[in-house]
């Protein structure tokens, strides 16, 4: 069975092929670089770029794998959550491929696919597992009874962790996206230089907006007027701010996990999303949690279509098909509270 996956939920246009053994045959990603000049993703520009790039990334994936569309058995496409225009372009393109080739099609949840990316490369994952997604748009924790079961435990109440990194990067004068650059600067700074901390939210939820504001005030000092320009800082000061911020942001997440693991009897942890590629965070969890940890490889942390094809294949084989595939910007997961699961 050969599955073709399509991903277009934000600013990456991607196509991948996964075979019957869930092995990646081809994985092509086209990133839209011009959003950097705007300091973030411009939805209309992203949609137009997907429309332009989808045919070429599909052709490239087919060429790399040495197959044609006739050899494809299933088409999987991201349909939620994400930028509605970008999702619509991907879903409609997938529908055209499915109709033209007379192949079955299945819709895939982008966030769930990030967790499946870790599962794809792991061996003998024990369930129930804690699923942690950390990206530019999401910071969510899930109870996973199996690879296809996702019940929401906790969520960010404001900014996502990746979004917070990008905004702090902007404060430090870094180009968009700023996450990887902050990690690099932090490795050269002192994480004890600034006593940053995020808001302590009751229960399992998270909050990063206060931490972001604290960093801004630390940079501006006494001149904290919102309209005042950001001062020039030495590279040493920037490195120290980056290190202190990074520690505070990740400790906020890490401190929530032991209670979740205990209350929901989690036997392993799956982590996904672009921020999961941060080596400081990986080391932090490895040093503080006594459970098997599974992170995707770097190529599967950021948005890609291999995770879409992999999860789509699994859903199809499990007969968990999507009826009436339509793009949807937001998605509401069943909560553990809905199932009367343990509360903090």
From Swiss-Prot:
GO molecular function: iron ion binding; N(6)-L-threonylcarbamoyladenine synthase activity
Record InterPro entries: ATPase_NBD, Gcp-like_dom, KAE1/TsaD, TsaD
Catalytic activity: L-threonylcarbamoyladenylate + adenosine(37) in tRNA = N(6)-L-threonylcarbamoyladenosine(37) in tRNA + AMP + H(+)
Similarity section: Belongs to the KAE1 / TsaD family.
Cofactor requirements of the protein: Fe(2+)
PANTHER family: TRNA N6-ADENOSINE THREONYLCARBAMOYLTRANSFERASE, TRNA N6-ADENOSINE THREONYLCARBAMOYLTRANSFERASE, MITOCHONDRIAL
One GO CC term on file: cytoplasm
Pfam families for this protein: TsaD (PF00814)
Gene name tied to this protein: tsaD
Enzyme class: transferase
Top-rank taxon, per record: Bacteria
Gene3D superfamilies in the record: 3.30.420.40
Keyword Cell inner membrane among record annotations: no
Entry protein name: tRNA N6-adenosine threonylcarbamoyltransferase
Taxonomic source organism: Chlamydia felis (strain Fe/C-56)
Lineage, broadest ranks: Bacteria, Pseudomonadati, Chlamydiota, Chlamydiia, Chlamydiales
Enzyme Commission designation: 2.3.1.234
């Amino acid at each position: 069975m050969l599955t073709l996956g399509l991903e277009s939920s934000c600013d990456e246009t991607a196509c991948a092929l996964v075979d019957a053994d869930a092995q990646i045959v081809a994985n092509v990603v086209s990133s839209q670089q011009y959003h950097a000049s705007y300091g973030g993703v411009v939805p209309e520009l992203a949609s137009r770029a997907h429309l332009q790039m989808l045919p070429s990334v599909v052709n490239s994936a087919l060429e790399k794998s040495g197959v044609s569309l006739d050899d494809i058995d299933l088409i999987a496409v991201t349909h939620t959550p994400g930028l509605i225009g970008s999702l619509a372009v991907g879903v409609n393109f997938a529908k055209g491929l499915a109709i033209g080739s007379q192949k079955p099609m299945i819709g895939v949840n982008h966030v769930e696919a990030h967790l499946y990316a870790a599962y794809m490369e792991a061996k003998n994952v024990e369930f129930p597992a804690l699923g942690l997604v950390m990206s530019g748009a999401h910071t969510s924790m899930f109870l996973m009874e199996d690879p296809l079961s996702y019940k929401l435990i906790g969520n960010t109440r404001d900014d996502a962790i990746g979004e917070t990194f990008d905004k702090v990067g902007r404060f430090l004068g870094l180009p968009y996206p700023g996450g990887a650059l902050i990690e690099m600067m932090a490795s050269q700074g002192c994480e004890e230089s600034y006593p940053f901390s995020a808001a302590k939210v009751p229960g399992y939820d998270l909050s990063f907006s206060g931490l972001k504001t604290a960093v801004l005030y630390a940079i501006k000092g006494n001149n904290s007027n919102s309209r005042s320009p950001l001062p020039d800082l030495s590279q040493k000061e920037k490195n120290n701010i980056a290190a202190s911020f990074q520690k505070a942001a990740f400790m906020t997440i890490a401190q929530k996990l032991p209670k979740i693991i205990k209350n929901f009897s989690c036997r392993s942890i799956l982590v996904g999303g672009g921020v999961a590629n941060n080596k400081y965070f990986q080391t932090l969890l490895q040093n503080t949690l006594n459970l098997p940890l599974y992170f995707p490889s770097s190529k599967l942390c950021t948005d890609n279509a291999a995770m879409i094809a992999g999860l789509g294949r699994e859903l199809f084989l499990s007969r968990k098909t999507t009826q009436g595939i339509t793009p949807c910007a937001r998605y509401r997961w069943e909560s553990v509270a809905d199932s009367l699961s343990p509360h903090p």
